[in-house]
Amino acid sequence: MTSPLSDLLNLDLSDTKKIIAEYIWIGGSGMDIRSKARTLPGPVSNPTKLPKWNYDGSSTDQAAGDDSEVILYPQAIFKDPFRKGNNILVMCDAYRPAGDPIPTNNRHKAVKIFDHPNVKAEEPWFGIEQEYTLLKKDVKWPLGWPLGGFPGPQGPYYCAVGADKAFGRDIVDAHYKACLYSGLSIGGANGEVMPGQWEFQISPTVGIGAGDQLWVARYILERITEICGVIVSFDPKPIQGDWNGAAAHTNFSTKSMRKDGGLDLIKEAIKKLEVKHKQHIAAYGEGNERRLTGKHETADINTFSWGVADRGASVRVGRDTEKEGKGYFEDRRPSSNMDPYLVTSMIAETTIL
């Protein structure tokens, strides 16, 4: 038996041409996702056809109270898995009324790099592995963990099945299907090493699209956990001690790296990353020093290293890439709370320009 509220939520709106567009943007902390909805007269498939909008930037730490208006520019459209039909999710970035980007608009900065002719010619692909931890809402302690206590040591939980090893799978599967419905290039999902921690992947996507897709996938995950009364944490080290942290490993390749002989170019790119190690670390996520300790499948934050199939290195090259002499590499330094606009554009800038 359905409730009156669920009946209203599932109302059939097919008799109206109007749609609901949920405008999504990033708040002042760089990790808080905000959104609000508006009615449009009919279906829209191109973001350039969407109206700009505004919001109170003084309530998101992005503007002063006496000049609080911040303008949203629609940039990417995805199907809305919550309202369904012709309703849409709209990824936006933020600008001052005069037209200049607000300081926290990393998307605008990234587009400049991805629009550079040398970068465009290389068709940079990014695949991002987003790890996260599910927490009980009232106590902010991982799902499946005894209240105030700890589960058994790590080992049985990675890609595991069973009620004593996998906690929150319904959320993971709902998120997976919602992302597919929305048109996101979600490539997979799996349980992680620490119990209560999971991962989903955005498959190789060109340029700025990888950042747009990861932010919308995060938004969908936040909405699903909201419905379930669970908190999703992107903290890179949510539990101190002998537990794995949470990362956003970023896989990268260029057109040249994907061709025969590309392994030599991958090695050259890795050398460039080593030279700018400190600059990348500074932009790879807040609190990352708690994760990058040299333990739990990480490299020490102060030391750059790379290796084939080495998950304790800063950068990993896969066995298949080594064997075929072409392919991609994985930057294992970005934390789970990184800004993908910043990370992807920095990798492209350092290795191509």
Curated annotation (Swiss-Prot):
InterPro entries: Gln_synt_N, Gln_synt_N_sf, Gln_synth/guanido_kin_cat_dom, Gln_synth_cat_dom, Gln_synth_gly_rich_site, Gln_synth_N_conserv_site, Glutamine_Synthetase. GO terms for biological process: glutamine biosynthetic process. Transmembrane segments: none annotated. Not expressed in roots. Residues 106-353 form the GS catalytic domain. Keywords: Acetylation, ATP-binding, Cytoplasm, Ligase, Nitrogen fixation, Nucleotide-binding, Phosphoprotein. GO terms for cellular component: chloroplast; plasmodesma. The keyword Plastid does not apply. It is found in: Cytoplasm. It comes from the Eukaryota. This is Glutamine synthetase cytosolic isozyme 1-5. The lineage of its organism: Eukaryota, Viridiplantae, Streptophyta, Embryophyta, Tracheophyta.
